[in-house]
Amino acid sequence: ESPLKGEEPDLEDLLGKVVNEKKFECTSDFTKIAGLDAVTLSIQTPFKNKEDLIPDFSALYEGIRNVGRNLRPGMLVVLESTITPGTTAGPASVMLEEESGLVAGIDFALAHAPERVMVGRLIRNIREHDRVVGGIDPVSTARAVELYSPVLTIGKVIPMTATAAEVTKTAENTFRDLQIAAANQLALYCEAMGINFYDVRAGIDSLKGEGITRAMLWPGAGVGGHCLTKDTYHLERGVQQLGNSDLDYPERQPSLFVLARTINDFMPRHMVRLTKDGLDLASISVKGAKIALLGWAFLSNSDDTRNTPSEPYRDAMIAAGATVAVHDPYVDHAPGISLMPSLEETIRGADAVVIFAGHHQYRSLDPCEIKTLTGKKHPVIVDGRNMVDPEAFIANGFIYRGIGRGDKNNHPVRN
């Protein structure tokens, strides 16, 4: 039985093929590294303390040292992990040299080739996305280009230095986080002004032609995952270590990128406010209320729960005295929580139904069926991903609240 969960097209078939052809092997024996031509490392690099820009590189450094102990002349080592700019040519190079007794750039090649994939699109992304590769010297760069070029079917390899590749990866995720924050902030503005964010978004997106586009992303209940929640801090740490003395920036002003992180981290708290507002209108106390939380994964149609924004929301509602039942069709287990076995059991008796994940199963929620399951005259529905038709639920007596839906969030309650 495959251990893969969620929707990952082609991955299971490809794994089965290479296993059957004996081209794929899992092992904990690091001595086998000595028989390889190239080694790639893709190990998580979280932060111990984001405020102090202190990353937890312990797992990555352990992996690097294990490679170094088994390194032989002529090999290529590639770091695929997202790392602070300067790591490949700095600490990684030093550790490999210390453990192997070899010299980076002379006895072995060393490069950075950051992964650029999304859960749910792994194989397609690997084959079709351009691949940034950067070595600590021209020979290392050329070796990395040679390694990755055959994998790409549509994308091309873009060579640069190792540090430039590190900045590219951290900056592309930082910029996406910034784009999401812009959408989230505008959604909050639209709620405050009583207008529909999605009307405004459509108007903004209509400006095209002559190379101009102002396409906006969608707002939502929060940003999760392993990458966007930390890569801003890798970039900030990189500029502090490599170029802080030369950085010309408005004095005593916070980083725009860090501010974007703050906005995105705020969105689960805004979902708490929307929930409490709805419960207040229904004359239901938060203390003792039952909340049906739909979605524990941070990404639509995925089982990836890393840094899920559902968690701070759940914690805040429990701290306020509510009971929270969690459902996710893709997640079998999550530390510290009990997942409900069915959507029906999750919603049964709920005072509020709160949508956190954009799973396709939640797009077909029927207001009549949901209301019957809750048993409430005026149940609350809070839509954090623009999944449902507000009017359909309002017409059935629901109290609706939604991210960016200032046009609906103050609707009169219908009997």
Provide a role label for each language-model segment.
Residues E1-N415:
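Structural/interface elements that position substrates and couple domains in central-metabolism enzymes
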